[in-house]
Amino acid sequence: MERDEYQLPNSHGKNTFLSRIFGLQSDEVNPSLNSQEMSNFPLPDIERGSSLLHSTNDSREDVDENDLRVPESDQGTSTEEEDEVDEEQVQAYAPQISDGLDGDHQLNSVTSKENVLETEKSNLERLVEGSTDDSVPKVGQLSSEEEEDNEFINNDGFDDDTPLFQKSKIHEFSSKKSNTIEDGKRPLFFRHILQNNRPQRDTQKLFTSSNAIHHDKDKSANNGPRNINGNQKHGTKYFGSATQPRFTGSPLNNTNRFTKLFPLRKPNLLSNISVLNNTPEDRINTLSVKERALWKWANVENLDIFLQDVYNYYLGNGFYCIILEKILNICTLLFVVFVSTYMGHCVDYSKLPTSHRVSDIIIDKCYSNSITGFTKFFLWMFYFFVILKIVQLYFDVQKLSELQNFYKYLLNISDDELQTLPWQNVIQQLMYLKDQNAMTANVVEVKAKNRIDAHDVANRIMRRENYLIALYNSDILNLSLPIPLFRTNVLTKTLEWNINLCVMGFVFNESGFIKQSILKPSQREFTREELQKRFMLAGFLNIILAPFLVTYFVLLYFFRYFNEYKTSPGSIGARQYTPIAEWKFREYNELYHIFKKRISLSTTLANKYVDQFPKEKTNLFLKFVSFICGSFVAILAFLTVFDPENFLNFEITSDRSVIFYITILGAIWSVSRNTITQEYHVFDPEETLKELYEYTHYLPKEWEGRYHKEEIKLEFCKLYNLRIVILLRELTSLMITPFVLWFSLPSSAGRIVDFFRENSEYVDGLGYVCKYAMFNMKNIDGEDTHSMDEDSLTKKIAVNGSHTLNSKRRSKFTAEDHSDKDLANNKMLQSYVYFMDDYSNSENLTGKYQLPAKKGYPNNEGDSFLNNKYSWRKQFQPGQKPELFRIGKHALGPGHNISPAIYSTRNPGKNWDNNNNGDDIKNGTNNATAKNDDNNGNNDHEYVLTESFLDSGAFPNHDVIDHNKMLNSNYNGNGILNKGGVLGLVKEYYKKSDVGR
């Protein structure tokens, strides 16, 4: 028999732990507990001195306000059916102001449950009667306007930056309440996902009522998401509940490789936990490990910090990996300081030429005799710092142990699985845990706990990072100095760390919410001045710490990279992305491990693009340097043969022997020789950059049509610079950063404050977040964006089970240079597309170190792509076809048509025979594309060939004949290939005078 969920609250002050865990719908708890204890909690006392809280009815003031209770949460699991139940629960406890202020409680009650609603309504009216406005619990951070209205209410128990109560009008209770953003504010495709991915109530889950078992089973059979063609979509559901199947595929393909590789196991909560009901915080150590993990989850006070810890645990690959990394970091610090101190004060270098043992050059009692005064003081400071790091490690071990128990017992994920498990699976397990009605003890986080999905979790984890992405892309920071060589904005890791400390530490409070003073226009001048003072103070501290930081990082970089450059001199030309490039490339709500994998995969293509451009001037200079250095090394080595024992110690200059110069000159020769480019590359920068865009997501509109030009390459190299240059900038930045903080950044303080005020958006349950991270399409102005309907947007971003977004779709989101607002909106649209691709496409569900399984092309002869490196001998060997080496990405083998417009892999033999026999190229193209049957089981692909720089200003328009004339020297201009074939081409080639040079 089902118990009544709505009972009158009583005054028994029990610790209702079960209400935080299992909510209103639990059927497996101890029957001795009253169900009202599981659905209510005491409202904190509000100061009765306010006129808002006085009632005109004297009899109601005699009742103890501690008995006044409001619902802790609407125990919905994000389904449409349960949202209706949520509405009934909210209305059951919502104050009916229209009737309460007049004392009229006549409701059209026809059931006993409605009578309970009337009684609860009258109880809550004691709090608000006598006022024209009412207060209801509000989840998350209060908006700045609402806080100004309620400033006269003194809530000592709550943080000023995270108020609990909000004013609301009566019509807000007549409409349906939701835990998420209103559907009208959701992006179009988000609404499509949320409407179609409404999860079904899982009838097998623990502690849930079974009154809708048959209804849910019937509905779940016909409620799978479908794509625009009407077929069931093969994708993942990370928006809503997790109690439904993780993938929904077609009936022909019910099995999925991801469900086999990463089987999901629902959290196995305790079936009898009545012992936890009266357990206070100071006695949780008496509980078992699993019970303690459940208690911790139920008493989460700050969901932002908790989810960030959960993600950092996943990012660190578990308990032992994180602890090992922290210990090794301390050991690295100790090693650098100990070795540098010992080598500087405990070795007598004057005895090196005459000594043969280490003991002969060691200074006895060097720490007491040689190290004195200033150096010893800083050594003691360093020892104290190491002790603090060890103490911090002790507390980190306790915290990580709790996270390990949370993963192991509540999410059913072991540490061994974290290295291969996709983050999407962790999100899915969190949603399972949420759907089992686990609540928080903090009323501010009640509804926030029910807002756990991929989008909201990413917003909580990246609340600060999203602001930083928008900040660095807006170019409002002045990072230059009014002196030569430093007039350009250069961001380094040192400067980035200081900006994060000064700006983000000032804007956000300890709870992780943005401060209300930042959002109030009336306090703009005050916040601007405070931020300026913060910049100047940070600059002063950097000046004091600069000598020690420079010394430490010089030694660290020397120990880390010297052996690499010594053994592999060619690595000195290695490149990496600059810090500003990483912030420009990163998308909103893109977690770090996804971004890191994407950027790491792009380095090969980035090197390919840079290496395509000739470096003749550099090569000539390096050849000369290598010749000079090699000559001196050869002379010294030759002279060493006559007297190897004495000549090696012969001093060429003061205190510089032959060995010294052989070592230095040999290193210079090796570096210069390995840097000279001696290989041939296909010059196709346009195709390479467009392919690189698939990983960097960065292709400015200004570059269009100029991909082959040197200035575009130089602009790209500013983002993808030499590693040695970046290291030198980092060392220089340690001395330049104090002046940037003191002179340059204070002038940007006003724009920074305006940026946070103008780009913050309030979301119920989340607080203030960066507006671009919410993917709200209504914020976009312009006719082009408003004209996008749901179908067109879905076509751009919808993905099925085996195909990801291709370059033609993604290139539509390239930033346009109409205005800064257009750039920001385009960045938001682009982030939205890739966010949906990361979480909706099953092909992207991989671990941190794994690549998605792409369907490759047939491994037949002639189907491989064009090689970047080839020799003339290979190109012109007998029987070789010169079309294989044409300009472009795709090789022309038997499976490709040589038409420069469109070619297909369908019917490859006929295409190649027609073209090789001299048939009309256009006819060959038509034959290749005539049978375009989507139901063909073969892997047929159709490509649009793009030319490198042929579409630029130098070559405005080229038709098919022009392309064939350019790419085939035997083309006669009539669409026919000459019968001279390869021999004729070789004959023409060897007529040139420069052959063999």
UniProtKB/Swiss-Prot annotation:
Predominant place of localization: membrane
InterPro entries per the UniProt record, alphabetical: Autophagy-rel_prot_9
UniProt keyword list: Autophagy, Cytoplasmic vesicle, Endoplasmic reticulum, Golgi apparatus, Isopeptide bond, Lipid transport, Membrane, Mitochondrion, Phosphoprotein, Transmembrane, Transmembrane helix, Transport, Ubl conjugation
Annotated consequence of substituting H192L: Abolishes interaction with ATG11 and disrupts Cvt, but not bulk autophagy
Effect of K113R: Abolished ubiquitination by the SCF(MET30) complex and subsequent degradation
Consequence the record notes for mutating Q392A: In Entrance 3 mutant; impaired autophagy possibly caused by mislocalization
Chain spans, region Disordered: 29-88, 128-159, 213-235
Outcome after substituting S122A: Impaired selective autophagy. Does not affect ubiquitination by the SCF(MET30) complex
Pfam family, one: ATG9
Consequence recorded when altering R560A: In Basic mutant; impaired autophagy
Modified residues (Phosphothreonine): T794, T804
Membrane topology: Multi-pass membrane protein
Segments in the Lumenal topological domain: 340-376, 642-656
Record-annotated membrane-spanning stretches: 319-339, 377-397, 621-641, 657-677
Effect in UniProt of substituting K701R: Does not affect ubiquitination by the SCF(MET30) complex and subsequent degradation
Biological function: Phospholipid scramblase involved in autophagy and cytoplasm to vacuole transport (Cvt) vesicle formation. Cycles between the preautophagosomal structure/phagophore assembly site (PAS) and the cytoplasmic vesicle pool and supplies membrane for the growing autophagosome. Lipid scramblase activity plays a key role in preautophagosomal structure/phagophore assembly by distributing the phospholipids that arrive through ATG2 from the cytoplasmic to the luminal leaflet of the bilayer, thereby driving autophagosomal membrane expansion. Required for mitophagy.
Assigned protein family: Belongs to the ATG9 family.
UniProt free text on domains: Forms a homotrimer with a solvated central pore, which is connected laterally to the cytosol through the cavity within each protomer. Acts as a lipid scramblase that uses its central pore to function: the central pore opens laterally to accommodate lipid headgroups, thereby enabling lipid flipping and redistribution of lipids added to the outer leaflet of ATG9-containing vesicles, thereby enabling growth into autophagosomes.
Name of this chain's protein: Autophagy-related protein 9
Lineage: Eukaryota, Fungi, Dikarya, Ascomycota, Saccharomycotina
UniProt gene name: ATG9
